[in-house]
Amino acid sequence: MPMAKNLVELRDVYKIYGEGRESEVRALDGVSLTIGKGEFVAVVGQSGSGKSTMMNVLGCLDIPTRGTYLLGGTDVRELTDKELSHIRNKQIGFIFQQYNLIQSLTVLENVELPLIYQGVNADDRQDMALEALARVGLANRIKHRPVE
């Protein structure tokens, strides 16, 4: 990505679900926002005000219906799925409101999952996951499912 003064820039961004229908929902309605390097930003608002939608757009999980989103000076609409995946993996961190573990996987498999996306080989991946689980006191629960 080219160097840019602003890390994030939204210009007149809309996210419209069911556009043109009677039940159309404008989750984002002309949002403009600039976040510079080193800035901290809190997104607050009432339930249903578009916070999660905006975070999904900012995190490259969703694209705006219209408007411009520049991430580090690059228009995210011009990026391929592979490039967006790389950005999500290497440049954007997510902390979800819910723990979002995959219920069908063991604790160990859930910890290994991001390492798979990073291309870490199976032996190293398991060693790294076991070490991380030991550090947080969960080494004895590696075969458990998240709900156990």
What would you call each of these model-derived segments?
Residues 44-46:
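The feature captures the beta-strand-to-loop junction immediately N-terminal to the Walker
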Residues 22-25, 76-93, 123:
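ABC ATPase NBD coupling module
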Residues 67-75:
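Conserved ABC transporter NBD signature motif
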Residues 59:
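Helix-to-loop junction immediately C-terminal to a conserved catalytic motif
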Residues 3-7, 16-30:
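A short, flexible loop at the N-terminus of ABC-type nucleotide-binding domains that lies
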Residues 74-75, 116, 123-141:
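Conserved ABC ATPase "signature" region
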Residues 83, 145-148:
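Conserved ABC ATPase signature
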Residues 103-113:
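Short coil-to-helix segment of the ABC ATPase nucleotide-binding domain corresponding to the Q-loop/switch region
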